[in-house]
Each structure stands twice: as structure tokens, then as C-alpha cells.
């Protein structure tokens, strides 16, 4: 059976997405249920800045179907400490202790390493060793030095997922590399043509046909166009699978 396309956006709480994506007049508390009725996944932006309280998490999970998946962005300060601090295990415990509240609706934790942080194989291995393995981990490492066989091998051995990120300022299209049990693609350009989205869908098809699920997350924008792109992406994959 082909894998599932779990498309979504970075965040959902954007009143400016009305009327293109959200109906006019929709109250703030109804944004997430409406989003989840049309899209199967969402990156939570606010967890990158602060750890959410349990009652807020319970509100999120109650608002979405059982097969919906949240991707939690690891809090940025603790992420750096987990990779380069004196107590990575302690930082990871702080980062992850609230995650069980998400239950089965937790899709993954997105661990972002900024462009100012070069590759360090020893510290990456310490992070992967200390990470709670039942929690799916996705690594987005932006410094070019992380694009190395050593990184791929370490992630593969730990069952962690390498994030593929497509950005406006990239001259070359990034490779999709399978290191874990699913794929994670961030489409972060400010705009995409249909031909460009078809090309990404086409590149995912062989992995999906091997049974891998693929998260595909678009950046948020001003009017909700990105949410519409995400909503149509699974159908786009089905179409290019047939037409080539």
C-alpha cells in the first residue's frame, strides 16, 4: 500500500487567511477544527518560542481527528543546549516531557539547527543517543557541513529523519534522503509554480510507493495560498503518479 501524504502548513492561527482558506467571520477557536477538516498535519510554530501548557495541548488534540498529526518544533534555546550544552540529556528531558500529552496525534518533533551551527558528529551522536526513541525525531540542519555521509549514517542508525528543506535562496534543488521511517519535506519558497510542485510530487512518488509516509509542510503566508497548495498536494501526487 502506498504511503500517506501528510500535507500542511507552519501554523494555523491566521485570521488573515479568510476568506481564501477560512470562511469569513470564523471565530478564533474554530480555526483549528476547520484547518483539520481540510489538512492532515500542522507544524506548531509557537512551540519553537515557548513550551505549551498541558491544557492548551489537550485543547489542540480535542479539536482534530484521530488521524491528524502535529509536528512540534523543539524550543530553540533548549535545542541549542541539547546539541552543544554541557547537559544534553537534561535539555532533552525538558524538551520532551510534555510530549506524551499529544498522544497518538504527535507526528514528530522538528529539531532545527540554525545556519550558524556547523556539523559536529560527536554532539549529534550524543543527542541521538539521549533522545527518547519512541518520539519520532526530524533533524533540519541548515549549515552546509551537515550534508555529509556521516550525518546520514548517524540518523539512519538512530531511526531519525533528515528534513529536506527548499528555500528561496537555494541555487540547487535539495536531495531527498531516506534515513528514517518516513519523509519530511519543508517547502519554504515564497511562491511555487504548478510545474515546480509537480516536480516535487514526482520525486516523492517512488518513496510513497515503497510504503513511506511523507510529511509535506508549506510556509505560512499572508492570505492562505500556502494552505490551498497544501490541501491540493495529495491529489497532485496521485495525478503525477498516473501521468508521469
Where are these predicted regions, by residue range?
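Residues lining hydrophobic/aromatic ligand-binding pockets adjacent to catalytic sites
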Residues: 1-244
Amino acid at each position: 500500500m502506498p504511503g500517506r501524504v501528510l500535507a500542511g502548513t507552519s501554523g494555523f492561527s491566521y485570521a488573515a487567511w479568510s476568506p481564501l482558506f477560512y470562511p469569513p467571520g470564523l471565530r478564533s477557536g474554530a480555526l483549528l477544527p476547520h484547518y483539520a477538516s481540510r489538512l492532515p498535519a500542522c507544524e506548531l510554530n509557537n512551540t519553537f518560542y515557548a513550551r505549551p501548557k498541558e491544557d492548551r495541548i489537550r485543547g489542540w488534540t480535542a479539536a482534530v481527528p484521530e488521524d491528524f498529526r502535529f509536528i512540534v518544533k523543539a524550543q530553540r534555546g533548549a535545542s541549542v543546549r541539547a546539541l552543544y550544552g554541557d547537559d544534553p540529556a537534561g535539555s532533552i528531558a525538558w524538551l520532551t516531557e510534555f510530549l506524551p500529552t499529544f498522544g497518538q496525534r504527535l507526528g514528530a518533533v522538528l529539531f532545527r539547527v540554525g545556519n550558524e551551527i556547523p556539523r559536529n558528529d560527536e554532539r549529534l551522536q550524543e543527542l541521538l543517543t539521549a533522545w527518547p526513541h519512541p518520539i519520532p525525531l526530524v533533524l533540519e540542519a541548515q549549515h552546509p557541513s551537515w550534508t555529509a555521509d556521516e550525518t546520514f549514517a548517524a540518523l539512519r542508525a538512530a531511526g531519525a529523519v533528515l528534513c529536506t528543506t527548499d528555500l528561496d535562496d537555494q541555487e540547487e534543488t535539495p536531495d531527498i534522503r531516506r534515513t528514517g521511517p518516513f519523509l519530511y519535506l519543508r517547502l519554504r519558497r515564497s511562491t511555487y509554480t504548478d510545474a515546480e510542485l509537480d516536480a516535487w510530487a514526482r520525486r516523492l512518488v517512488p518513496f510513497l510507493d515503497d510504503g513511506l509516509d511523507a510529511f509535506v509542510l508549506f510556509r505560512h503566508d499572508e492570505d492562505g495560498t500556502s494552505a490551498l497548495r497544501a490541501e491540493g498536494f495529495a491529489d497532485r501526487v496521485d495525478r503525477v503518479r498516473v501521468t508521469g
